[in-house]
Amino acid sequence: MKIAALITGKRVETISSSATLHDLVNALNVHHIGALVVSPDGKKIEGIVSERDVVRAMPGKLDEITDMRVRDLMTQDVITCTPTSTVAELMTVMTERRIRHIPVVDESGNLISIVSIGDVVKAHISDLDSERKALSDYLKS
């Protein structure tokens, strides 16, 4: 299955690198998501920041975190995929790199969506179920 099938109609939330930690936590909570793409315009990707990044910033820095900016927490070397990437490819990358979110970009590198590990697992289960059904139908004939 191609990633294009997973992103149809899916909105991607972004945040500015100058946003505060408070803004970040609020956006994650309001949108019920685990990561935001860091972008100045909703197209160019500067980084990605997740709830895990927030948790990792806390130990020993509780007095400092209120002044932190998204740029202080985000991952700048962002792994991306395209709509033509496959679910199997993303499963491999996400497992090997231990990441939960991958932005989807067009041929110009502009952000068009984001895929989570949950999206990938659901698609993989759907693929397996379709394969199981096809094999079952074949054996019945």
PLM features: what roles do these ranges have?
Residues 1-3, 20-21, 33-36, 53-57, ...:
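Short acidic/polar alpha-helix capping motifs at helix-coil junctions
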Residues 1-10, 50-95, 117-141:
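Tandem CBS (Bateman) regulatory domains
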Residues 2-17, 38-45, 106:
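Short, charged helix-to-loop "capping" segments that act as catalytic/coupling loops
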Residues 15-32, 38-40, 80-98, 105:
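The conserved cystathionine-beta-synthase
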Residues 28-31, 36-53, 94, 102-118:
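A glycine-centered beta-loop-beta connector
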